[in-house]
Amino acid sequence: MTTLRLLISDSYDPWFNLAVEECIFRQMPATQRVLFLWRNADTVVIGRAQNPWKECNTRRMEEDNVRLARRSSGGGAVFHDLGNTCFTFMAGKPEYDKTISTAIVLKALNSLGVNAEASGRNDLVVKTREGDRKVSGSAYRETKDRGFHHGTLLLNADLSRLANYLNPDKKKLQAKGITSVRGRVANLVELMPGITHEQICDAIREAFFEHYSERVEAEIISPDKTPDLPNFAETFARQSSWEWNFGQAPAFSHLLDERFTWGGVELHFDVERGHITRTQVFTDSLNPAPLEALAARLQGCVYRAETLKQECDALVVDFPEQETELRELSHWIAQAVR
């Protein structure tokens, strides 16, 4: 019986691909070695312990229809588009060893004429006249009896967009989440013009087979029909949920301040698990009552722009004479927390 399994995803949906990865990892026999090859369309993928409001330009992501996906491994935030090739290696313990999977990727790159090397704990770099340039980043996850190593290879990614979505607005935000480290990066196409996703996948697959002296047929995973993986529907629902992608953020505080023609406003939010646990309001407005009422209404609310806007708009019923000010405040809050 073969000990290898090779899966290739036809989907560009990050929630689908991460759900497939999670299901395979949970259910694989401890004696199996798995290679999963995939890629995502326009997505910011954050680490398990990260705060999306701190790491990402969430407003620009929303405007550009860029998805947010929280993975189950640690590490920092990365931007994925179809110029990235993603790989996942899985194995049971004690065989699981990220140095083996790293060596397989390095061998695959070398077979394509790219002389890369491991750098630090997570990166693969190539040496250029401008210095070391990162072409791959990785993250890892281990349980009691198994582990996985997943990462991306920058093939022909739009690096300008990477900077757009991973450089957040200068929000007055204090958080305990892990901060992503930005590094000098390079696309493999700069080093090997014409290189394709298919070539990289073929090279990784061949290096994988060669290392284990065994070959298997690839299983194509498609969104056209539900994958034959136990609990996939439930795993996908969780992976695609706001509660997982945003609500799992570490506790943080957010300060918003603005000056309107009718007065200055400071809002202090304490947020835990994506819900507001405390709101403090400071203002020099001649009529602070609507703002005080807003602070009370927001207790326990989900920290989402549309929710905060709805709560603010609802105050017009109680304070009709301040409708203009409340609409202005509502619009500002919705923009500020995105």
From Swiss-Prot:
- State the similarity comment: Belongs to the LplA family.
Q: Which PROSITE patterns match?
A: BPL_LPL_CATALYTIC
Q: What is this protein called?
A: Lipoate-protein ligase A
Main function: Catalyzes both the ATP-dependent activation of exogenously supplied lipoate to lipoyl-AMP and the transfer of the activated lipoyl onto the lipoyl domains of lipoate-dependent enzymes.
Its subunit composition reads: Monomer.
Give the EC number(s) listed in the UniProt record. 6.3.1.20
Q: What gene does this protein come from? A: lplA
Signal peptide start and end residues:
none
Database matches in CDD domains? LplA (cd16443)
Keyword entries, A-Z? ATP-binding, Cytoplasm, Ligase, Nucleotide-binding
One GO term of the biological process aspect? protein modification process
